[in-house]
């Protein structure tokens, strides 16, 4: 069974955390309307109460920036690091001139699944194990702009 994990950047200190992703509705305040909090939690318990499911216990939660949330692909890079959506991976394995020394952004498409995209080519998940994570689009966007590594 595939491990379902998400990763996001904490609002409090810009630290990356991974775990379960929950969008929690904050209480309604008159005149303010409904608001939502995006959280990553390390443990999640769902209880069934009056035919409604709700989150009963969340021991440790982290508020995260929803723009930074990405899902774990279920795969690891050449160094054994977990590959998440929006990671930047460098392929430099003498595979072919179309992908060697290229930086790929890991993306997800609902119909196609996970894939890596560069400015000139794509890679499929079966190639991920030959790549190395060098950053992500939030912390190291300059790698993506370069497109290739020297």
Task: Give residue ranges: language-model regions.
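Secondary-structure transition motif
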Residues: 1-150
């Amino acid at each position: 069974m595939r491990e379902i994990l998400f990763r996001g950047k904490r609002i409090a200190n810009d630290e990356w955390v991974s775990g379960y992703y929950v969008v929690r509705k904050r209480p309604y305040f008159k005149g303010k309307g409904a608001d939502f909090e995006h959280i990553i939690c390390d443990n999640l318990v769902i209880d069934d109460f009056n035919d409604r499911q709700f989150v009963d216990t969340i021991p440790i939660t982290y508020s995260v920036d929803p723009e930074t949330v990405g899902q774990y692909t279920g795969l690891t890079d050449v160094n054994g690091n977990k590959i998440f959506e929006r990671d930047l991976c460098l392929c430099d394995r003498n595979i072919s001139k179309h992908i060697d020394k290229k930086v790929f952004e890991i993306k997800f498409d609902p119909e196609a699944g996970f894939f890596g995209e560069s400015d000139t080519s794509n890679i499929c998940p079966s190639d991920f194990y030959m790549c190395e994570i060098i950053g992500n689009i939030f912390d190291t966007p300059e790698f993506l702009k370069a497109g290739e590594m020297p």
